[in-house]
């Protein structure tokens, strides 16, 4: 199963993780997650006041889903969830949640890292520090 979307709403990472686990079966031996948060100092503005996450395309949800599908196929995962914040957010706010499940930890760690690297290329969501 693949769940992927962008949202202006605050990420409820615990609810998303709980829902993910409720969809799991005994085919998964490992669940790995990445919970990305906005940190200081910033990359462009060390002491930024806000961060803007701006969509660069109209189909952000489909782009996230494509990354999730690629990870699922490439790493033979059982389930993938990718959720990305949009809009104006603060330091310490959650920006990205990626959760994967599969048979073994090595494929799950590799897949989760690959998803984060793909999203961080900023090809369809731009991060602007103010």
Residue ranges and their predicted role:
Residues 1-94, 101-130:
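N-terminal, polar/charged subdomain of small-to-medium soluble alpha/beta proteins
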